[in-house]
């Protein structure tokens, strides 16, 4: 029985980390009808190809948003950084499919569904400050409008290009599209296979500027957002989900 190696691991964004799912196990359970992605996929997303593969009897896995999580830690910088806050941005709405026998996976994150500074995630990140509700709302608004330009670029996309390694530890090469720019990177993964699903987790650090994103800065840079952000992810996908 072949340990399903080719799948994915991110974002970011984003992401990113989403990439992970590609590592689905090829020793899949019986093929069941494939449910459509919830919430609407982006234009051009190859959902039809995955659904056709499932109809042909091939093992196709769908990402389970309720069991998946992508978290991005955004940290402050500048001479007056102590007056600002670090932030945690999360997606609970990762969508997409994995086709293990082709070593293929395509994932997406809707940026307008990102949430900011959930208390539990702030605690996990070790952030001790507690921004007010107004500060959180302002951070989210600035992120979507000024930083990510979410109306113009509403999705972050991940496409798996290959997976290397055996056993629990793998490395996925993925193309991430964010803010209209596509970058390819290697993402380390930890893979846990189960009877009817797989969980893939990992983390990476990337520069916002690599995607043409300009981190927010005020007071001449005295308070600003660091260019580098840390992304950690846990992606679960199952057959016929």
Where is each model-derived feature located?
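Low-complexity, acidic/polar, glycine-enriched regions of mature
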Residues: 26-241
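Bacterial N-terminal signal peptides that target proteins for export
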Residues: 2-14
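Long, low-complexity, intrinsically disordered N-terminal extensions of eukaryotic proteins, enriched
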Residues: 2-3, 22, 30
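Bacterial N-terminal signal peptides
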Residues: 12-25
């Amino acid at each position: 029985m072949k340990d399903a190696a080719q799948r994915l691991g991110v974002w970011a964004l984003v992401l990113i980390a989403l990439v992970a799912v590609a590592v689905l196990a090829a020793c899949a359970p019986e093929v069941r009808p494939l449910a459509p992605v919830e919430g609407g996929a982006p234009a051009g997303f190859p959902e039809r190809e995955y659904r056709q593969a499932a109809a042909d009897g091939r093992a196709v896995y769908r990402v389970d948003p309720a069991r998946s999580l992508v978290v991005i830690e955004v940290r402050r910088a500048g001479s007056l950084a102590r007056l600002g806050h670090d932030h945690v941005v999360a997606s609970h709405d990762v969508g997409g499919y994995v086709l293990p026998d082709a070593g293929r996976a395509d994932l997406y994150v809707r940026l307008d569904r990102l949430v900011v500074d959930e208390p539990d995630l702030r605690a996990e990140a070790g952030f001790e400050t507690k921004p007010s509700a107004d500060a959180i709302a302002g951070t989210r608004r600035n992120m979507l409008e000024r930083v990510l330009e979410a109306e113009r670029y509403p999705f972050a996309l991940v496409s798996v290009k290959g997976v290397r390694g055996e056993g629990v530890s793998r490395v996925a090469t993925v193309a991430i599209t964010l803010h209209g720019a596509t970058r390819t990177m290697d993402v380390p993964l930890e893979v846990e296979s189960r009877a009817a699903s797989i969980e893939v987790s990992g983390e990476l650090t990337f520069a916002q500027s690599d995607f043409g994103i300009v981190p927010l800065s005020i007071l001449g840079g005295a308070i600003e957002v660091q260019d580098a952000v840390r992304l950690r992810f846990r992606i679960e996908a199952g057959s016929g989900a």
